[in-house]
From Swiss-Prot:
Chain positions of motif DXDD motif: 403-406
A Pfam family hit: Terpene_synth_C
Residues where substrate binds: 270, 490
GO CC, one annotated term: chloroplast
Localization per Swiss-Prot or TrEMBL: Plastid, Chloroplast
Lineage: Eukaryota, Viridiplantae, Streptophyta, Embryophyta, Tracheophyta
Pathway: Terpene metabolism; oleoresin biosynthesis
Protein name as annotated: Bifunctional cis-abienol synthase, chloroplastic
Taxonomic source organism: Abies balsamea
Transit peptide: 1-49
Molecular function in Gene Ontology: copal-8-ol diphosphate synthase activity; magnesium ion binding; terpene synthase activity
Chief localisation class: plastid
Gene name for this UniProt entry: CAS
Length: 867
């Protein structure tokens, strides 16, 4: 049959293959005319001739009236008279054109924003590059203790007069001393008491002294109403001891108040727990508060527990107290070292090098700006890893005491970045009752340290029971904290720690997509958060307005690009005729979110487009094969795909023509892009993937039509293909900016199999009951029950869930272990498995996205700017 070719100008048939020496090659989508080739795309209402780089489109008259398959769009459908498609309607897409256009008109990224982004990146790189032993704010409390030290030359002057001058110059307007930008009564009371004692000792600053006493007298009577949630570390030890000292100095302060009596009782109870054996042989947190233990401590014995740097747990106050009792030169050298750094004051804790580096890395990662600082992050983590200890780490490289907060943060981040670290380090912080605490042998724990252990526990590998124990313990603790309205922290005062805990519990790692976490943390991050030792302190390299500003600008810039891509994909879907199909789900935006929530960077634009198009086609063909198409139609469609033959279109009903042309055109276009990217032809490779996919769909259709329930193993073998994850990924990886990618992953890859299997099991767990109501008899749960007729449905469900959890742990191991698979490919595979967990969190989130929380996630990630 002669094929007419349409003139690009007149739209009139100008020749035929016979008269123009033209050849049409169906499997390549090419027309060759007089020796020149053009690729064509066919769709229900147009032919697009591709010449050179640009597509040139010319409308045809209705194709059923032409000689190009003259009956291809006729009303005949060839459906067997005894086949009736199921009467199942899917919800329409929430994301229609009006909604998309109205939302995406909300903001545009300006040129000034892009310049500001570059400026902020440069400034934050400077933060990384200037990290030393830790940037932290002044501690009036510790500075007052250092200012007490008399000159070592015997003169009646302070050894560090600049610290005394700092106290005189830094009294706050209300007469107190302490953290200026955050009022915490405990902090102000303790710092003020320390300062007025120091001024009394040196008989100076009468004005400041009287103002300080006045503040103290007014504030201490209000302390009965203060909650214990943010009482500074060691307050009950040092505060009563300092009151005794103030009394001996003749300071006119109230000493008989209920609050003071309560603190005295707490101190006595704590001192009773201290044994001589522990005090002088084991480094514990008591070393942090030695200034409050002078009446019971033999300071000559305590010296042997001194840290390498000469301090006692990095506390200037504790170290100053020991020096005044012993004259130890290493104590003095430490204080001189700190003052060389800070000049006229000292911080609450120093150094804080490990703490600062880990929290800065965690901050930029959670805010989604880490891609701008890859080298800086590696340098910071190399430093931390060089200090890693199998017993755990503390806040500084030479800290003699490990804490679970820094250890858990370090374990999680180092493992995620490929460092070899063992979770056995957590055993240090587990007591005989199976509970986890911040310090070995202590009973203290707070929300942030338990939250960090919980986050850490989720990067577990198979067989790591300590991680499972940590997860159960911390999850229980955090849920109780929320239920009891006790989501306050012992170690930090954060903008929205409750929000952080709620997010972590609702969206654990395998369900939390990167952009979803970023959007949440932008709202929870506090650029003015403060930490709590013996006094409040700020860490400007951790809590910083610049991080938040960059996070918002960067998020909105990327989001603007994503919106442009969505509009293009919606147009593609419409021009392909897919919106006219009534039997399937229109889920362009949802499938785009599935990839953009992970591979969000501008350089992965083609990757996102391909992922979305393949996903849309999978949804359509899944619905076609899953009951709407008759057995003969399915067989015909599969044969057309196998032969890649457009001539079979004339035997198809209209809806199948749309499906086949959409698949045909998209695969050819993707293959051409893949050839450019990979440097070799990939059309055969992509077609083969689709043949495998449709074979799996066909097998499921045969099971459904025959009411056949396979064995569990037989089901799993097919189901991990039919879920479509492998088809999506094995095509999309061609566009992850990696060379020779196909040498690293294929259908036999364990990593890919686990991603497919966990996605399938998650889907079955949440949808099998609804599918059964629609006549489906095959799911992992039903197949497992067939193999074991004696078990209940609940037991089968429990088994399938346990299998999925174990496979997720295996997936962790495959993702994080060191091998030759490129990181971008790993990330795409792993996050596709994660997004499957997210979509099935409440049920079938793809089908019913308009009524589930997934809709809100899409809004926040793709349409609502961060403000």
């Amino acid at each position: 049959m002669a094929l007419p070719v349409y003139s690009l100008k007149s739209h009139i048939p100008i020749t035929t293959i016979a008269s123009a020496k033209m050849n049409y090659t169906p499997n390549k989508g090419m027309i060759t005319a007089n020796g020149r080739s053009r690729r064509i795309r066919l769709s229900p209402n147009k032919i697009v001739a591709c010449a050179g780089e640009a597509d040139r489109t010319f409308p045809s008259q209705s194709l059923e009236k032409t000689a190009l398959f003259p009956d291809q769009f006729s009303e005949k459908n060839g459906t067997p008279s005894n086949f009736t498609p199921p009467n199942r309607e899917f919800p329409p897409s929430f994301w229609n054109n009006d909604i998309i256009n109205s939302i995406t008109a909300s903001h545009k990224v300006q040129t000034g924003d892009r310049k500001r982004i570059q400026t902020l990146i440069s400034e934050i790189k400077n933060v990384f590059n200037s990290m030393g032993d830790g940037e932290t704010s002044p501690s009036a409390y510790d500075t007052a203790w250092v200012a007490r030290i008399p000159a070592v030359d015997g003169s009646e002057q302070p050894q560090f007069p600049q610290t005394l001058e700092w106290i005189l110059q830094n009294q706050l307007k209300d007469g107190s001393w302490g953290e200026e930008f955050y009022f915490l009564a405990y902090d102000r009371l303790l710092a003020t008491l320390a300062c007025i004692i120091t001024l009394t000792i040196w008989r100076t600053g009468n004005v400041q002294l009287h103002k300080g006493i006045e503040f103290f007298r007014k504030q201490v009577v209000r302390m009965d109403d203060e909650a214990d949630n943010h009482r500074p570390s060691g307050f009950e030890i040092v505060f009563p001891a300092m009151l005794n000292e103030a009394k001996s100095l003749g300071l006119d302060l109230p000493y008989e108040l209920p609050f003071i009596e309560q603190m005295v009782k707490k101190r006595e109870a704590k001192l009773k727990m201290i044994t001589t054996n522990v005090l002088y042989t084991i480094q514990t947190t008591l070393l942090y508060s030695l200034e409050g233990l002078h009446e019971i401590v033999d300071f000559d014995k305590i010296i042997k527990l001194q840290s390498k740097d000469g301090s006692f747990l990095g506390s200037p106050a504790s170290t100053a107290a020991v020096f005044m009792q012993t004259g130890n030169t290493k104590c003095l050298e430490f204080l001189e070292f700190v003052l060389r750094k800070f000049r006229n004051h000292v911080p609450s804790d120093y150094p804080l090098d490990l703490f600062e580096r880990l929290w800065v890395v965690d901050t930029v990662e959670r805010l989604g700006i880490d891609r701008h600082f890859k080298k800086e992050i590696k340098d910071a983590l190399d430093y931390v890893y060089s200090c890693w200890d199998e017993r755990g780490i503390g806040w500084a490289k030479d800290s003699p005491i490990a804490d679970i907060d820094d250890t858990a943060m370090g374990l999680r981040i180092l493992r995620l970045h490929g460092y070899n670290v063992s979770p056995d380090v957590l055993k240090t912080f587990k007591d005989e009752n199976g509970e986890f605490f911040c310090f070995m042998g202590q009973t203290q724990r707070g929300v942030t340290d338990m939250l960090n252990v919980y986050r850490c526990s989720q990067v577990a590998f198979p067989g790591e029971t300590i991680m499972e124990e940590a997860k159960l313990c911390t999850e229980r603790y955090l849920r109780n904290a929320l239920e009891n309205a006790d989501a306050f922290d012992k170690w930090a005062i954060k903008k929205n720690i409750r929000g952080e805990v709620e997010y972590a519990l609702k969206y654990p790692w395998h369900r939390s997509m990167p952009r979803l976490e970023v959007r949440s943390y932008i709202g929870n991050y506090g650029p003015n958060d403060v930490w709590l030792g013996k006094s409040l302190y700020m860490m400007p390299y951790i809590s910083n307005e610049k991080y938040l500003e960059l996070a918002k600008l960067d998020f909105n810039s990327v989001q603007s690009l994503h919106q442009e891509e969505i509009r293009e994909l919606v147009r593609w879907c419409k021009s392909s005729g897919f919106t006219e199909l009534k039997f399937t789900r229109d889920r362009v935006v949802e499938t785009y979110f599935a990839v953009a929530s992970s591979m969000f960077e501008p350089e992965f634009s083609t990757c996102r487009a391909v992922y979305t198009k393949i996903s849309v086609l999978l949804v359509i063909l899944d619905d076609l094969y899953d009951g709407y198409g008759s057995p003969d139609e399915i067989k015909l469609f599969s044969e057309a795909v196998k032969r890649w033959d457009l001539s079979l279109l004339e035997q198809m009903p209209d809806h199948m023509k749309i499906c086949f042309l959409g698949l045909y055109n998209t695969v050819n276009e993707v293959a051409e892009e893949g050839r450019k990217t990979q440097g070799h032809d990939v059309l055969g490779y992509i077609r083969n993937l689709w043949e495998i996919q449709l074979a799996a769909f066909t097998r499921e259709a045969e099971w459904s039509q025959g009411k056949y329930v396979p064995s569990f193993d037989e089901y799993i073998e097919n189901a991990q293909v039919s879920i479509g994850v492998a088809t999506i990924l094995l095509i999309t990886i061609l566009f992850t900016e990696e060379d020779d990618i196909l040498s690293h992953i294929d259908y036999g890859s364990k990593f890919l199999r686990l991603a497919s299997l966990t996605a399938r099991l998650a889907n079955d767990i949440k949808t099998y009951q609804e599918e059964r109501a629609h006549g489906e008899v095959v799911s992992a749960i039903q197949c497992y029950m067939k193999d074991r007729p004696e078990i209940t449905e609940e037991e089968a469900l429990k088994y399938v869930y346990g299998r999925m959890v174990n496979d997720l742990a295996e997936l962790n191991s495959e993702y994080l272990k060191s091998n030759e698979m490129p990181q971008n490919c790993k990330r795409l595979v792993f996050d596709t498995a994660r997004v499957a967990q997210l979509f099935t969190m409440e049920g079938d989130g793809l089908t019913y996205s308009d009524t589930m929380e997934i809709k809100e996630h899409i809004k926040k990630c793709l349409f609502e700017p961060a403000t």
